[in-house]
């Protein structure tokens, strides 16, 4: 592995983090907040990292998948470490809690260890939202978009940070495609901010929640999340943009080029829409029949929590008090997540479709061994290699949930709570049930559990394979050529 090239890219990433940290620094200085010293030190540390990496780095165009994977993995390690510095240096959180909050933000999980946000400076709250926004599209994807040129490494970096199976052939024009996705991401953020302001929310709060919404994180500037606003238009628009953020941004780009009918012809998006509508109807009916909830209120909280817990993690109602059936539907949505190419995590709707179609193909071939079943996704043939990757990912996803839940239960969590927390952290959702319900935080968990969940959140965001590759001895051998 060419460690010098990896260091060179990490140096540029560190300088980019310094530039990002400078934004809340300006807010802290203008607002005369006590956090300005913490942000100033964070900027200096980021610059120091950039200089240190640059000292032992050099650019190169001769890169392999191994360098791309290393850059992605260590890029996330570096980004989350530098991102935790304002919390740590400002004495708002201890080391592990600061790291947890940073990873939670960048991975779009939205799980917080702040006991309360009252008294926390706006610059710190804004930085939490920035981590959600940067990590939503992807630290590496945004970094690629801001690079003045593209090369072989960008393809490997993009693949390593990928967000689900896709049949789009974007690699030959990867840099152009990434810039386009970044522009769409910006446009969505601006539109969301403007609409939130029309709903009566102040600009600073509207911008913060827009970044968290489009980044599908769920961080809020208030302890009671979106329940704080008691604003129906705000909730409905938030639900709409959470739903859109759970869709494929590359699909939106194609719709811009070829027309909106592309979206409706996409099998994954249609399935995603169907899942959201079906889950909303089931939960609303369950709330009406089991709790006697008013129909309009049941529909309101159902549509919000369905779109939220399949992507983001905002809270508009205490779903801990809901019937078991509704909780199980929400838990299933956490597992599924959003679409491939979205800012949401989970197993992705595309994988769910392929798993179901592959199972159907196996059943048909059992009935007729000579039958050849062609598996497609939106009209494109899916080969055996991709089906194998999808099946392997699904197995590993369930394995991570099982291991995480086992370790949490060993640390004292109730079995159902442990499973729910494992699902919500690997799915990068945030709120779960029990000890970390809609109205709770992750602060009561032990350091052991928090450390486990830090790793689980990263595994979920990087889709397991990238981090598992680091455990392969051949990855670190100088003589091994990938």
PLM region spans:
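Membrane-proximal intracellular helices of multi-pass ion channels
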Residues: 1-482
């Amino acid at each position: 592995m060419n460690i010098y090239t990896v260091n060179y890219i990490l140096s540029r990433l560190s300088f980019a983090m310094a530039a990002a940290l400078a934004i809340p620094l300006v807010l802290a200085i203008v607002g005369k907040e006590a956090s300005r010293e913490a942000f100033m030190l964070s900027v200096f540390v980021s610059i120091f990292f950039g200089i240190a990496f640059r000292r032992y780095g050099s650019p190169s165009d001769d890169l392999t998948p191994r360098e791309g994977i290393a850059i992605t993995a260590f890029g996330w390690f570096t980004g989350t470490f530098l991102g935790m510095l304002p919390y740590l240096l400002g004495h708002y959180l201890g080391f592990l809690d600061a790291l947890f909050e940073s990873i939670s933000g960048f991975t779009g999980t939205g799980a917080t260890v702040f006991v309360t946000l009252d008294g926390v400076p706006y610059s710190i709250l804004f930085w939490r939202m920035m981590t959600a926004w940067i990590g939503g599209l992807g630290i590496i994807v945004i970094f690629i978009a801001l690079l003045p040129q593209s090369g072989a490494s960008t393809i490997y970096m993009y693949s390593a940070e990928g967000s689900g199976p896709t049949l789009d052939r974007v690699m030959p024009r990867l840099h152009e495609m990434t810039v386009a996705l970044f522009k769409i991401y910006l446009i969505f953020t601006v539109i969301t901010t403007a609409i939130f302001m029309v709903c009566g929310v102040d600009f600073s709060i509207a911008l913060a929640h827009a970044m968290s919404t489009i980044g599908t994180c769920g961080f809020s500037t208030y302890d009671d999340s979106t329940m704080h606003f008691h604003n129906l238009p705000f909730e409905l628009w938030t639900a709409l943009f959470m739903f859109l953020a759970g869709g494929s941004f590359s699909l939106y780009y194609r719709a811009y080029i070829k027309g909106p009918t592309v979206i409706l012809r996409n099998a994954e998006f249609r399935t995603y829409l169907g899942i959201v509508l079906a889950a909303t109807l089931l939960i609303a009916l369950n709330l009406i029949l089991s709790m006697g909830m008013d129909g309009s209120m049941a529909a309101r909280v159902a549509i919000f929590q369905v779109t939220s817990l399949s992507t983001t993690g905002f809270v508009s109602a205490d779903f801990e008090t809901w019937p078991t059936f509704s909780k199980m539907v929400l838990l299933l949505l956490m597992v599924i997540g959003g679409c491939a190419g979205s800012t949401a995590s989970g197993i992705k709707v595309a994988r769910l479709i392929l798993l179901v179609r592959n199972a159907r193909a196996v059943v048909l071939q059992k009935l007729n061994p000579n039958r050849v079943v062609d598996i497609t996704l939106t009209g494109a043939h899916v080969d055996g290699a991709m089906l194998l990757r999808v099946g392997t990912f699904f197995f590993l996803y369930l394995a991570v949930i099982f291991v995480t839940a086992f370790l949490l239960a060993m640390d004292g969590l109730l079995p159902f709570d442990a499973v729910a927390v494992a699902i919500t952290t690997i799915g990068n959702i945030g709120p779960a049930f029990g000890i970390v319900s809609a109205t709770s935080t992750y602060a009561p968990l032990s350091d052991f559990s928090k450390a486990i969940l830090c790793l689980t959140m990263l595994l979920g965001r990087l889709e397991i394979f990238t981090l598992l590759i680091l455990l392969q001895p051949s990855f670190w051998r100088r003589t091994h050529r990938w």
